[in-house]
Amino acid sequence: MKKGIVAIVGRPNVGKSSLFNRIIREKKSIVEDTPGVTRDRIYGTAEWLTREFIVIDTGGITLEDQPFAKEIKVQAEIAMEEADVIVFLLNHQEGLSDEDKMIAKILYKTKKPIVLAVNKYDKKTSDFDQYEYMSLGFGEPILISATHGIGTGDLLDDIIHQMPSHEEINKDNRTRVSIIGRPNVGKSSLVNSLIGEERMIVSDIPGTTLDAVDSVVKVNNIEYTLIDTAGIRKKSKIFQNVEKYSYLRSLTTINGSDVVLLMLDASVPISDLDTNIGGLAFEEKKPIIIIANKWDLVENKEKEILKKEDEIRAYFKYLAYAKILFVSAHDKTRITKIFTAVEDIRTALDKKIKTSVFNEVLNKAQLINPAPNFNGGRLKIYYGAQVEAYLPTFVLFVNNPDYVHFSYKRFLENQIRLQFGFEGVPMSIIFRERK
């Protein structure tokens, strides 16, 4: 399910990055770091009032060696294109500037919800004239100190209040399939082959070659939205306006997808950039299919396929649940299997396991492989149940969660996948002490 997107916009030195860090720290659940996965500092997930949303720090994508006006233009473009809510941040210590007024004119044209926040406010020493800021036309400002946390709760309350509902954000009822990968792995060629193979394209949604371009295709009476993202490049290469914009579009496209196709070039070795791109989808907990493209360029295919699969599994250990398909977009070899794999994932996402059946599998798993001693005791699982379907989530009631060894958790996950068919779908297993 797509999350809402919040963009923090403002001129330099108003505290955008400080506010970004403050909001991200407000998230109550901390996700464990995973080897091979990197998180870009301009993009993060937060939670407030049980609502998860994505935060974009436009301060993290300022242009180098560019005039100030172009920097503001890039920030506004990103906000207009991607955000569901825009936080317009001002600096109380410096007051309202001409640059602030220029940004306000740009943001006013977006017709999107604007939350006006005035940062660097110290209520003990500062005078405040709210009418000066209300003259911008965005209503009453919220006074905050991002550094000290003053007023950030009120700000988050207003953000959630202004954000569209889950239903409105996810109003496209087609299965949204995004195709991600580094440049030149054949993403656009694959989309063209899929559309050409089916010969049933419904429409093309206009975009540019640097944007994520949507195409709608119908297969077996099921409509899919295929999203071809611009190639994600190494961060060190992302200097120009268009490249930074493209990178951010790829990140937000992953957020809006139901299934992600991670494309690799099977004819060359896997790179760190490939694994980092896969990590973007992994962190968003998206169902993933790994597409090894350009298989037509590989010689001795029968001999090489096992080697290549082992290489992929070694580099993408955190995507052990993902299915691997070897295809050629150029000669259309095996590309129809992609839709079959997507439908398998759709089925898995809708699957709800009966508690009685689930516990039978759980008991058999413990007989096959009893839990080892760990942290001074042995894990005993009393019973479990599925509590959520879309991201399959299982709660297991145990004697002590501290006795769970990571390898045994992985064993249980593999058994659940094997018995119930959750290939390609991320899964969550929660251990709770029985009371």
Curated annotation (Swiss-Prot):
Q: Give all residue intervals belonging to the EngA-type G domain.
A: 4-167, 175-350
- Ribosomal protein as a keyword of this entry, yes or no, is no
Query: Care to name a GO molecular-function term for this sequence?
Result: GTP binding
Where GTP 1 binds, per the record, is at: 10-17, 57-61, 119-122
Give yes or no: UniProt keyword Nucleotide-binding.
yes
Kindly state a single biological-process term from the GO annotations of this entry: ribosome biogenesis
Q: Which CDD domains match?
A: EngA1, EngA2
* A UniProt-annotated Pfam family: KH_dom-like
Q: Which domain of life is it from?
A: Bacteria
**Residues involved in GTP 2 binding:** 181-188, 228-232, 293-296
**Any idea which UniProt keywords this protein has?**
GTP-binding, Nucleotide-binding, Repeat, Ribosome biogenesis
Which residues span the membrane?
A: none
Domain named KH-like is located at 351-435
The text of the family note is: Belongs to the TRAFAC class TrmE-Era-EngA-EngB-Septin-like GTPase superfamily. EngA (Der) GTPase family.
What this chain does, per the entry, is described as: GTPase that plays an essential role in the late steps of ribosome biogenesis.
Q: What interactions and quaternary structure are annotated?
A: Associates with the 50S ribosomal subunit.
- What is this protein called in UniProt? GTPase Der
Gene name tied to this protein: der
